[in-house]
Amino acid sequence: VEELTLRQMQEGALNILKKLDGICREQGLRYFLFYGTLIGAIRHKGFIPWDDDLDVAMPRPDFDKLVAYCRQHRQELQPMQLMTVDDNPRYVYPIARFSDTRYRVKYQGIRDYGLGLFVDIYPLDGCGNTEEEAKAWVQQPMRDVKFINCCAADQFTPSRRGWLHTPAKLAGFAWARLHGSAHYIHRIEAWARQKDYEKCRYVGCTVWDTNWNIVFLREELEKTLYVPFEDAEFPIPAGYDRMLRHTYGDYMTPPPPEQRIGQHFYTVWPKEQGAAEEHKEGAIS
């Protein structure tokens, strides 16, 4: 079976997003397009042409409700599956992925954990009520984020800073693998949950990134707008402009042609004939 083209990957991911959107609407769960997908919605009214995945974010209370819903309705959601470390012990990330199991994904340099074509779901937690508090808070899990990345890698790679730094990196890699990704994911999640999303002025996906530019004012996320994305409409934060400028700067100007490449480095192919037939038709349903 042939690998999916970029456009076929986008079509498949869009179908997954439509399923997720239906669940969130039915259950009254807050979510919105995020990161590069949000740029795509504003700048291209769909995918960034060279992007190869979809990102959404959810306040932690809604994220928890989605996880509970997907576990309760596991059988009827098939072939869709929500991936977390508690649902799949081989899973290696503190975010969730809503995955179509009729496909198989193979990352370059990442351990195989049975992922299908997917949509990333980023849980948003509180970061504090002042800029100083939020900046300090978001830095705290940096070590655990690095350990999680060690657990996700399919093999050790020497330090890019030279051979003198490689032994220390190898020791950290071995220590992380000894404990396993679940240990660090549970620890970083317990840390992130200490600050209540609903009570903090600043929020962000602190289990995923430790940079200040991914921390936002909660008021920017409180209201959502529905905007065109490909052949459907999905919610985005009403404060999207300030958010995107905070993270990306001039997000409305595309990068130069030589930088217009996907960032995730994976291949996808259908495991089932039905999935393959969908892409032969070339239709977004």
What are the language-model segments listed below?
Residues 45-47, 60, 143-144, 265-273:
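Charge-rich, low-complexity amphipathic helices
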Residues 131-136:
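A short secondary-structure junction signal
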Residues 66-68:
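Conserved SAM-binding loop
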Residues 1-25, 70-129, 148-249, 253-285:
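Conserved catalytic core of two-metal-ion nucleotidyltransferases
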Residues 21-54, 58-64, 219, 246-247:
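Active-site nucleotide-donor binding segment shared across nucleotidyl transfer reactions
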Residues 138-141:
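Short, His- and charge-rich active-site/binding loops that engage polyanionic ligands
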